[in-house]
């Protein structure tokens, strides 16, 4: 294998603001670490002229070269520009290069979660269906965040390709008490209300600090809890999170259990593992399975009583036991391991 590959992304690597934009760069860096020579297409699709120019240059590179496979990290929504569909057809049908694509989201399939209505929804759904038709015609394998999500789609060759961990250097936590970190939205579906109500109840029986990282505009949703002595609020991202994580010895994912949450796999799960934090999570199917399979924490129902019971049971000693398994899970689920999985495309 020459280790020459094509990599198509829809982000600007200099503007990484969300999980969907961070992931393509992590994959890219892991490919480089594994010794791959990458012909790369980047650029935001809403910058149409720039995208078409980049696609033309990418096409010229493909014409001249030989490549083992092509990997695609698509946008969160549908593909806007026809040049990208044409590239996939050219790579697959003319150059005969095997293509694998990561299909990140299925919001558009589910009315309860999909916020668009009326003609906008019809147009976006039509675009998603057109994308899927092109994918079925051009791709040898489709990767999904989880197996459960993959089961919703009809495709012969499919695999789960969840986010990865970073091999960060982490100091051993010396907390004498349980201190929890939560990074994310505080809306009800993401478990904000459940988390705050439960921690308030716990703190009537024993001290337990919550380090909560959220956006500034969400502070109003914290209501009566924002001034509680057990709650520390931060607005941090990127490297700023390291200091917050260092304060905690336990992480939490308190999502409301529903059909969509059952098949999603949050990036934060693997970020928590990267910082070697055991995890308490509600019983959303794929998250719960990962935690239980790796024995890296506790799983509860999405109600106050169940979460309260788990938090009352947890202590520094069993956190240290879970921490040993977290370190193993971290090594087994790096971005480099994800890239090794993708590299099997060359054998198809």
What do the PLM-derived regions correspond to, one by one?
Residues 86-94, 109, 118-142:
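Membrane-proximal helix-turn-helix segments that form the acceptor-binding/catalytic region
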Residues 69-70, 90-112:
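Active-site proximal beta-strand in glycosyltransferases
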Residues 19, 302-304, 315-347:
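A charged, aromatic-enriched C-terminal amphipathic alpha-helix characteristic of glycosyltransferases
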Residues 124, 129-171, 182:
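Donor nucleotide-sugar binding/catalytic pocket of nucleotide-sugar-dependent glycosyltransferases
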Residues 190, 241-244, 251-271, 281-289:
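Nucleotide-sugar-dependent
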Residues 23-27, 166-168, 176-223, 234-241:
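Conserved catalytic-core segment of nucleotide-activated headgroup transferases in glycan assembly
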Residues 60-85, 96-100, 141:
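Short N-terminal targeting/anchoring amphipathic segment
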């Amino acid at each position: 294998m020459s280790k020459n590959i094509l990599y198509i992304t829809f982000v600007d690597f200099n503007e990484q603001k969300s999980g969907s934009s961070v992931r393509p760069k992590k994959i890219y860096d892991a490919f480089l670490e594994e010794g791959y020579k990458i012909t790369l297409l980047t650029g935001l699709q809403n910058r149409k002229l720039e995208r078409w120019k980049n696609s033309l240059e990418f096409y010229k590179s493909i014409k001249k070269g030989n490549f083992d496979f092509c990997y695609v990290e698509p946008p969160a929504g549908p593909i806007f520009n026809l040049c990208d569909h044409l590239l996939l057809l050219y790579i697959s049908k003319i150059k005969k290069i095997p293509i694998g694509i990561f299909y990140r989201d299925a919001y558009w399939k589910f009315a309860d979660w999909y916020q668009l209505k009326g003609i906008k929804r019809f147009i976006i759904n039509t675009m998603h269906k057109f994308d899927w038709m092109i994918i079925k015609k051009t791709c040898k394998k489709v990767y999904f965040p989880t197996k459960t999500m993959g089961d919703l789609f009809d495709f012969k060759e499919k695999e789960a390709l969840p986010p990865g961990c970073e091999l960060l250097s982490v100091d051993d936590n010396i907390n004498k008490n349980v201190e929890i970190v939560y990074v994310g939205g505080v809306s009800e579906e993401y478990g904000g209300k459940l988390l705050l109500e439960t921690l308030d109840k716990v703190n009537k029986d024993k001290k337990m600090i919550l380090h909560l990282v959220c956006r500034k505009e969400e502070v109003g949703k914290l209501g009566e809890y924002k001034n509680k002595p057990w709650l520390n609020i931060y607005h941090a991202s990127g490297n700023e999170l390291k200091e917050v994580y260092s304060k905690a010895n336990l992480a939490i994912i308190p999502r409301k259990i529903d059909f969509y949450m059952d098949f999603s796999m949050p990036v934060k799960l693997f970020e928590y593992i990267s910082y070697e934090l055991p995890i308490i999570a509600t019983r959303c199917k794929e998250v719960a399975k990962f935690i239980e399979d790796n024995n890296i924490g506790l799983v509860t129902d999405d109600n106050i009583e169940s979460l309260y019971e788990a938090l009352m049971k947890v202590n520094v000693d069993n956190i240290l036991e879970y921490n040993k398994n977290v370190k193993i899970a971290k090594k087994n689920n790096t971005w480099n391991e994800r890239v090794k999985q993708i590299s099997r495309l060359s054998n198809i």
